[in-house]
């Protein structure tokens, strides 16, 4: 491993490894199966704090890390064993290259890359109270018209916004929340008074 590679910021490393995995599984025509295997692995990683700490720790040898990653992959019941093997081999490469600390970011970047290939976009919707399924569908259709692709909604309820919505789509944010409108009104009134 070259010293210059160690200086590359982790998000860029995430993207490069994710792209490499995506290119490989696309060639192997197993994108969907590997995507499911990655999702299964991320669920396990998210549920086990000890595993998260292990992945983040630089104090374990490569041999120990390889052994643990192999064991984790063997214990996950992947729907497709071939996809599980691809993921296991990929985890070994990451471990040997001392990038295990970036594992979560790499796998999330892979999921993002797969979504982009399908022209899917994630949108986070924050509302003061839960939206009805009809409202969610109308919102999804409106956003799909804007992005010209499939939109996956991630709903979140935050009563502190009082009303309205906050929509985060990529690097854009549309904030129509009542709390923001009240803050704007407060600032405008302060300007008028002074």
UniProtKB/Swiss-Prot annotation:
Gene3D superfamilies: N-terminal domain of the delta subunit of the F1F0-ATP synthase (1.10.520.20). Keywords: ATP synthesis, Cell inner membrane, Cell membrane, CF(1), Hydrogen ion transport, Ion transport, Membrane, Transport. PROSITE patterns: ATPASE_DELTA. The keyword Isomerase does not apply. Belongs to the ATPase delta chain family. F-type ATPases have 2 components, F(1) - the catalytic core - and F(0) - the membrane proton channel. F(1) has five subunits: alpha(3), beta(3), gamma(1), delta(1), epsilon(1). F(0) has three main subunits: a(1), b(2) and c(10-14). The alpha and beta chains form an alternating ring which encloses part of the gamma chain. F(1) is attached to F(0) by a central stalk formed by the gamma and epsilon chains, while a peripheral stalk is formed by the delta and b chains. GO terms for molecular function: proton-transporting ATP synthase activity, rotational mechanism. One of its GO terms (cellular component) is plasma membrane. F(1)F(0) ATP synthase produces ATP from ADP in the presence of a proton or sodium gradient. F-type ATPases consist of two structural domains, F(1) containing the extramembraneous catalytic core and F(0) containing the membrane proton channel, linked together by a central stalk and a peripheral stalk. During catalysis, ATP synthesis in the catalytic domain of F(1) is coupled via a rotary mechanism of the central stalk subunits to proton translocation. InterPro entries: ATP_synth_OSCP/delta_N_sf, ATPase_OSCP/d_CS, ATPase_OSCP/dsu. HAMAP family: ATP_synth_delta_bact. This is ATP synthase subunit delta. The lineage of its organism: Bacteria, Pseudomonadati, Pseudomonadota, Alphaproteobacteria, Hyphomicrobiales. It is found in: Cell inner membrane. It is a peripheral membrane protein. It comes from the Bacteria. The keyword DNA damage does not apply. It comes from Bartonella quintana (strain Toulouse) (Rochalimaea quintana). Pfam families: OSCP.
């Amino acid at each position: 491993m070259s010293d210059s590679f160690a200086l590359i910021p982790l998000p860029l490393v995430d993207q490069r490894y994710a792209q490499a995995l995506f290119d490989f599984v696309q060639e192997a025509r197993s994108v969907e199966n590997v995507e499911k295997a990655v999702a299964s692995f991320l669920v396990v990683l998210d549920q086990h704090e000890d595993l998260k700490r292990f992945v983040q720790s630089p104090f374990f040898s490569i041999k120990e890390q390889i052994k643990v990653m192999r064991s984790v992959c063997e214990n996950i019941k992947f729907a497709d064993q071939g996809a599980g093997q691809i993921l296991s081999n990929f985890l070994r490469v990451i471990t040997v290259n001392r990038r295990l600390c970036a594992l979560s970011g790499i796998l999330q970047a892979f999921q993002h890359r797969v979504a982009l290939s399908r022209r899917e976009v994630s949108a986070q919707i924050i509302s003061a109270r839960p939206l009805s399924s009809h409202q969610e569908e109308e919102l999804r259709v409106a956003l799909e018209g804007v992005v010209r692709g499939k939109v996956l909604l991630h709903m979140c309820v935050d009563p502190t916004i009082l009303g309205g919505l906050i929509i985060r789509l990529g690097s854009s944010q549309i904030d129509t929340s009542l709390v923001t409108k009240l803050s704007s009104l407060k600032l405008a009134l302060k300007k008028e008074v002074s």
